[in-house]
Curated annotation (Swiss-Prot):
Residues 668-677 have a biased composition (Acidic residues). Disulfide bonds join C207-C220, C260-C273. The lineage of its organism: Viruses, Viruses incertae sedis, Naldaviricetes, Lefavirales, Baculoviridae. Pfam families: Baculo_VP91_N. Residues 1-18 form the signal peptide. Residues 223-281 form the Chitin-binding type-2 domain. This is Capsid-associated protein Vp91. A zinc finger (C2HC BV-type) spans 147-196. It is found in: Virion. Glycans are attached at N210, N333, N371, N413, N510, N520, N609, N722. It comes from Epiphyas postvittana nucleopolyhedrovirus. GO terms for molecular function: chitin binding; zinc ion binding. One of its GO terms (cellular component) is extracellular region.
Length: 826
């Protein structure tokens, strides 16, 4: 019994000992211990003569770029004391002095590739650089900061290569051994071979059964099958290139290809030549080849008697021994369907590589498509211009997709077309403005886009041309049936139907202007004197001058709208009595300034608010005749209406005296028939013209007629206070501030302010003159062309732009001015 107890105790002690040993063994890091021992030994060697060994010693244990770790350990047992992390751009560790000191200079990189040796790399220390080498068949990869195996196909063209000892170790056994492979360099694997692909990648492949790889021809060759077989022995061997009437037999211990007699085929089941159709014994789906077809064709049986010819990109034979098509059509233009095909993009302006297709034996093994989306596609300059060219985001360069620059993109043309966004005037400016290709890199640099655009264009007006060819930038006279330049609207060409010749050149002088919607392109306005002409010579300022206004102070002419309106109002509001009995209007009371500024005054009449009384007599009045003696009465008779005054006592005091008027009585109510004072004459003097311009195209004309008569001023006030409005035009009632103003309010309702016999009215047009998609801008393209029509909260107002109060939605129109609006283009 005691022996059993002792045995059990012994086993227990052994188990405990094993556990303790394993714990110590597995926890103990022999490599780390050896490193610390080496550090301690090195320190002792270099400093023991000067310093005693410290209790704690530090050393740099790990480095990652500019960050390093200092590990401190006890020198008596080499156990870790503590670890600290540091940045070598701030401080460096002096191993011998065992202290830190400030970094004297910043080290750009601790690890760098060697410029002359891909197998080497450079380590930068605090005081010097050390060149290190990777193992053989390795190169240093700076991106990974490590040594990586060399690609076996780096220096080999696409094709098949024998598998030597090094390739076998590295690619098959995944072993990178540091040994001398030159001893067995002549040896190769019999069936395995290396296949280098066109994209630089590789695969390890093996020859079929009964085949051996021939390094001399770089192909798999069939092993001899006729060893020990008699002549005439037919082999059950059918190579891919064997025709339907051919078979393989032995002759002198070698296999040779034989043919069946004419009109015979070789039956591979009967293993003999038969006189029959190739499909007779095999049926539908069987495939075969003949001598009269191409290398990429084969016949496929439809039934026992018919077959069809199949043409492929590449003909192969599958595992069932039947022919089939393989390959990608994109590889068809490559020799043997193997190689690299770089995709090139070419347009009128640029040429660049957009990607790469890599094929091997007519199969696509890799394809790279770079992101060639247009970096300019969403750019709109000056809110209306876009570039009719594309610059890619990426291009294919040196085997990868990289950002596109003018260094890897070829420029084919120094200019490119520019297109403007659609506008309400249907104006196409592609012949007026051409872009310079030098603009593109400046735009990509992020400069002010609008300024960069405007400074890098060519204008037709700058070269004295009506238009420019959008592609070649050459001057042209026609593009279609008419050609004009809205940036220089002084002329236009009427062309033939085919657009190959000029029928007539129009020149717009004073009184005429370019009207784009008229067939003859000519509009007339007696006041217009090319006020919309742009005088800038700087292209940036010209292209920015899309909307501006010209104000002109001039005289009212006898035939213009001011004369017509005020003449009509004067006739209507001039009266002889309080009952507004109108007098026949006479032009002798109307004074219109002709082109020379001549002021014409009326005859001597009493004006309203005059302070000079009437004369006692009129020396030019008709003389009266005395009926008694037929003599003319004197112009002035001092005794007329006189009485003889006699004193009561007589004497010299008697005399003639004037007849005294009756006593002054209170004023009585004037008789309704009492004539009104004569009214002031109609004076037509000044007017303001406001021309709205779309570049050099006059779009709207606002006329401000000055009123210089009290009658007209009162009439204007009366008209504005008594405006009539059609029910459907109630939202547009404020159009009355400007006559002939128009607003489209939606739902087929177009309203216009008019002056008629009844006064000023805002009426609904039977058919709207214009229908706008954008009610707020009163346009179709979202541009506010008419600056004198304003929209707010569903209400419409016509008001000169300089008098409009947007906050209060109010028109601060003057009492002595009447406004009239003309649309000069429609």
């Amino acid at each position: 019994m005691s022996d059993v107890v002792l045995l059990v105790l012994a086993i227990i002690f052994i188990i405990i000992f094993v556990l303790i040993y394993c714990t110590i063994f597995f926890e103990f890091d022999e490599t780390t211990f050896s490193k610390r021992l080496h550090v301690l030994t090195e320190y002792a060697k270099r400093t023991n003569a000067e310093h005693p060994t410290p209790d704690v010693l530090g050393h740099v244990s790990d480095v990652y770029e500019h960050t390093y770790i200092v590990t401190w350990f006890n020198t008596n047992d080499l156990s870790v004391y503590h670890e600290t992390v540091h940045d070598d751009t701030i401080e460096v560790f002096d191993f011998l002095e065992q202290k830190f000191s400030p970094a004297k200079s910043t080290v750009a990189q601790r690890v760098a590739p060697s410029a002359s040796d891909p197998n080497a790399f450079v380590l930068t220390g605090d005081k010097s650089e050390v060149k290190m080498h990777c193992p053989q068949h390795f190169n240093f990869d700076y991106n990974q900061l490590k040594c990586v195996p060399i690609n076996p196909c780096d220096t080999r063209a696409p094709g098949l290569y024998a598998m030597d000892e090094h390739l076998l170790d590295a690619l098959v056994h995944s072993q990178h051994l540091d040994k001398d492979y030159t001893i067995n360099a002549h040896l190769q694997h019999p069936t395995l071979y290396l296949r280098c692909l066109a994209d630089g990648s590789y695969v390890v492949q093996e020859c079929p059964d009964n085949y051996t790889f021939d390094a001399a021809t770089s192909e798999c060759k069939v092993n001899e099958l006729c060893q020990g077989r008699p002549d005439g022995y037919v082999l059950d061997y059918f190579p891919e290139t064997l025709l339907v009437n051919e078979f393989v037999e032995c002759y002198e211990s070698k296999h040779v290809v034989k043919q069946c007699p004419e009109q015979h085929v070789f039956d591979r089941q009967l293993m003999t030549c038969v006189q029959a159709h190739p499909c007779a014994f095999n049926g539908a789906g069987h495939t075969y080849i003949t001598a009269d077809i191409g290398d990429t064709q084969y016949f496929e049986c439809l039934n026992n008697q018919e077959s069809q010819l199949i043409t492929c990109i590449n003909r192969v034979r599958n595992t069932d021994g039947q022919y089939a098509c393989s390959g990608d059509a994109r590889c068809a233009n490559l020799t043997d369907g193997t190689g690299q095909l770089v995709h090139m993009h070419v347009d009128d302006t640029f040429e660049y590589a957009s990607g790469q297709l890599v094929c091997d034996n007519f199969e696509v093994i890799s394809e790279i498509d770079c992101n060639t989306s247009d970096v300019l596609t969403n750019m709109l300059f000056l809110q209306k211009f876009k570039l009719e060219t594309e610059f890619p985001r990426q291009v294919f360069d040196n085997g990868e997709c990289v950002p596109a620059t003018f260094n890897n993109v070829r420029v084919l043309n120094d200019t490119f077309p520019i297109q403007n966004v659609p506008n309400d005037y249907n104006i196409d400016m592609q012949t007026s403005i051409i872009g310079l290709t030098d603009m593109i890199p400046k735009l990509l640099a992020g400069d002010d886009l609008d300024d960069t655009f405007g400074q890098n264009v060519v204008l037709a007006r700058d070269v004295g041309a009506v238009g420019l060819n959008p592609v070649t930038a050459e001057p042209i006279d026609c593009l279609g049936t008419q050609l004009f330049d809205v940036l220089d609207a002084s002329r236009a060409n009427i062309c033939t139907e085919s657009g190959d010749g000029v029928l007539k050149t129009l020149k717009f002088e004073n009184g005429t202007f370019l009207s784009v919607f008229r067939d003859n392109l000519t509009g007339s306005d007696i006041d217009y004197k090319r006020f919309c002409a742009i005088s800038y010579e700087n292209s940036l300022k010209i292209v920015k001058s899309d909307h501006f206004e010209r104000r002109i102070l001039t005289n009212i002419l006898q035939s213009d709208v001011c004369a017509d309106l005020y003449t009509t109002m004067y006739q209507k509001y001039t009266t002889l009595a309080r009952k507004y009995t109108t007098t026949p209007f006479q032009y002798t009371y109307t004074f219109v300034k002709p082109p020379p500024n001549i002021v014409v005054y009326a005859k001597n009449i009493q004006l309203k608010n005059a302070t000079i009384s009437k004369p006692a007599f009129d020396p030019f009045a008709n003389k009266q005749i005395d009926n008694k003696n037929n003599l003319a009465k004197p112009l002035f008779d001092p005794f007329k209406n006189a009485v003889w005054y006699s004193e009561p006592d007589g004497g010299d005091g008697d005399h003639w005296g004037p007849d005294l008027p009756p006593p002054v009585q209170p004023d009585s109510e004037p008789d309704e028939s009492e004539p009104e004072p004569e009214v002031s004459p109609l004076i037509l003097d000044k007017k303001d013209l406001f021309y709205s311009c779309y570049y050099e195209l006059p779009s709207f004309k606002l006329t401000s007629c000055y009123a210089e008569n009290d009658v007209i001023i009162d009439a204007i006030t009366d008209l504005r206070n008594n405006v009539t409005v059609d029910a459907e035009c109630e939202p547009a009632k404020d159009l009355h501030y400007v006559l002939n103003a128009y607003a489209y309010t939606g739902n087929g309702v177009g309203c216009r302010s008019v002056f008629n016999d009844d006064g000023v009215a805002v009426i609904k047009e039977p058919i709207p003159s214009y229908v706008f998609a954008n009610l707020n801008t009163q346009s179709n393209d979202g541009v506010h062309y008419n600056r004198h029509v304003h929209v707010k909260d569903g209400r419409y107002m016509a008001c000169p732009d300089h008098l409009y109060d947007d906050v209060e939605f109010r028109c601060n129109v003057e009492a002595d001015k009447l406004y009239y609006l003309d649309n000069m283009q429609f």
